[in-house]
Amino acid sequence: MGRLAAAAETRWAPLVVAVAAVGVWWLQAVAIPLAGGRDFATYLGAYSELFHSDPIDLGYVLGRTPLSPLVVGVLLDPFHGALAEPLMSLLYAASVTAWFLAARSFGGAPALLTVAIVLLYPGYGIVMHELSSDSVFAIAFAGWSLLVVRVLRSPSPRGFALVGLGVALLVLVRPGNQVLLVLAVIPLLVSARWRTRLVSSAAFVLAAVALLAALTVHNGVRYGDYTIARGGNTRLPFERAFLTDRIVRPENGPSSRELARAVRRELLPQEPYRSYGVHLDDFFSDPSPRMIDDLGALANRKWGWENDARILRDVAIEAIRTHPGTYSRGVATTVWDLLHQPVFRVLYSGGDARQNSGAPEASGTQDTIVIGGRTLPRPTEGQRIPAPHEGGPTSPDGSIYTVWTSPIEHHLVFLRSADEERYIALHQRMDELRANVPDRAGNYTLALRLNQASRWFPPPVLWLVLGIVGLAVRRPAGMLALVTPAVAALLVIVLDALAIPSVPHYAVPAAPAFVLLAAGSLAGPRPATVRMPP
C-alpha cells in the first residue's frame, strides 16, 4: 500500500488514472451505450433554440440554464454524433481525475481509495452514459470540488473569486445550484486575518453574482424575461407539496382557495378532465404530473406571464404551514432515499439496453376504463388524464394553444402561420439530434449485471457516515477543504428533497464528495503536533 500511495503522488499518476477511466467507461459502454437520459427532449429543444433570435418555445430556453443543453448538443451535433461516445469517455475520465487530484491534496492513500471507489461505482458509470444535466453536473461538480480543495489548502481572495465563479457555472448547469451561494460563508472560516476573510467572501459573492447577473440581463434582453430560469415556483416547494405529500387543499389559505376557484372554473370543465370525471376533490387528492403542467399554464394565463406562477409558491407555503409535519417527514424520507437508493439503467425485455427514456415499462393492465358509462382509453403511467389540457409550447402572448376535439384527441392551434412553420422546424431539428444518439443495442445481460452491481454497491450514506466518524476520531489535517465538497453535495440533495420526490440521479453526481470525505478523514494525515519542552 505504501508503494502504491507513493506512486499516486508522482507526476504521471493523473495520466494513468485518466487512461484507466477511459477504459472503464468503454467497458461499461459494451453493456450500456451512451443514451438519452432524464428529460432528454428538453435539452435537445433548448440546444436547438439557443441560437435562434426568436425562439418558438420559451419553455426550452428559459426553463433550463444553458450549459447542460449546450454540452448535450455539442456532443451530438458534430459529425452526426460520431464523436459523442469518445468525447463522453474523456469527460468521464476528466471527472474521475479531478476527484483523484482533489483527494491527492490529502495524500497518496486517500487518492488511491477515492479513485478506486469512484471507478468501481456502478451508479456513477450509469449516469455518465446518459445525456442529461445529471452527467453534465457530475463533470462540473468534480472540477469545482477540485478547485475548492486547492483554494482552501492555500486560501486567497483570488482563489475564492474563482470558487464563486465556479458556483455560477454550476447554476448554469442546473438552476437549483443557486443554493450553493450560501457557501460564501466558507472564506470566513479559514485561518487568516479578518480583513482577508471578508475580502475573500466578497470576492466569492461578486464573482458569482456578476455571471448570474449577466445571464439574467441576457434573458431579459433576448427573451423579455429578466430571470435566471423560469419554472422554479412550480417546483420548489409546490411540486413536492402537491404531487408527493399531497397536502395542497383549498382550505389551506386564501391563495389556495383562489387557485381552487380557477381550477374549478377554467380547467375542470375542459377536456380531458370533463370526460375523465376529475372533480375538484380528485384534482387535489389524486394529483399527477400532467396536472402540474396545466397548473403552470393556468397560472401564467390567469395571473400573468411576468409572475412566473408565483401563486403556486404561495399555495405551497400555505400547505406547508398547515401540514408542517407531513412535509418535514416527506423531505427527511426523500433525503434518506437519495443517500441510499441506487441508480439503475432502464432495460427492455427485448434485450435492448440503449435508451433510458425514464418511462416505465408497460404494466400489462387493461387498456380501457369506464367512466360515467363511457369506455375510454386508460391514461398511461397510472395518471388520471391522458395528457395535459395545455401541452404545447410556452408562449407569453397565448398565440399557441391546444384545442381538444374528443376526450383523447387534441391539436395545436397557431394564430400565426409562421409560428407553426418554426415549430415544425424545431421538432425536425430535435429529431435530427435524437437520431445522432449511438444506435448500438448494448448487451442486455451485462447491463442487468451492472444494475445488480449498482444495487449492492455501498450507498453514498455509508461513505458519509465513515467520513463523519473519521473526522470525529482522527481530526485529519485540512478538515475544511475535506468537508466543503461534502457540504455542497448535501446542500444540493436537501434542496432536491424540498422540491421533488426521490430521484437517485440527482444525488449520484455529487456522491464522490462523500467518498473523498471518507478517504481523506480515514487515510489522510493528522495535523502535526507541537511537543512542549520538558
What are these regions (language model features)?
Residues 30-45, 58-71, 79-82, 228, ...:
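Extracytoplasmic catalytic/substrate-binding loops of multi-pass membrane glycan-assembly enzymes
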Residues 12-15, 99-120, 138-139, 153, ...:
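Transmembrane-helix signature of polytopic, membrane-embedded enzymes
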Residues 9-38, 207-219, 490:
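Transmembrane signal-anchor helices characteristic of membrane glycosylation enzymes that use polyprenol
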Residues 72-76, 84-98, 137-140, 454-465, ...:
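Transmembrane alpha-helices of multi-pass, membrane-embedded glycan-processing enzymes
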Residues 9-14, 79-83, 301-302, 310-312, ...:
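Membrane-interface anchor segments at the N-terminal boundary of transmembrane helices
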Residues 35-38, 42-44, 48, 204-311, ...:
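Juxtamembrane membrane-water interface segments immediately following transmembrane helices
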Residues 160-174, 207-215:
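Membrane-interface alpha helices of multi-pass inner-membrane proteins
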Residues 38, 63, 84-91, 116-148, ...:
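Multi-pass, polyprenyl lipid-linked donor-dependent membrane glycosyltransferases
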